[in-house]
Amino acid sequence: MHIVVCIKQVPDSAQIRV
């Protein structure tokens, strides 16, 4: 579940980067 990590890291750039 790296998607959640991306949202926490860059919620502005990668809201839900799959």
Curated annotation (Swiss-Prot):
Lineage: superkingdom: Bacteria
Determine if rRNA-binding is one of this entry's keywords: no
The UniProt record lists the keyword Nucleus: no
Q: Which GO terms describe its biological process?
A: nitrogen fixation
Q: Which UniProt keywords apply?
A: Electron transport, Nitrogen fixation, Transport
Q: Which family does it belong to?
A: Belongs to the ETF beta-subunit/FixA family.
Q: Quaternary arrangement and interactors, per the entry?
A: FixA and FixB form a heterodimer.
| Record's function text | May play a role in a redox process involved in nitrogen fixation.
Q: What is this protein called?
A: Protein FixA
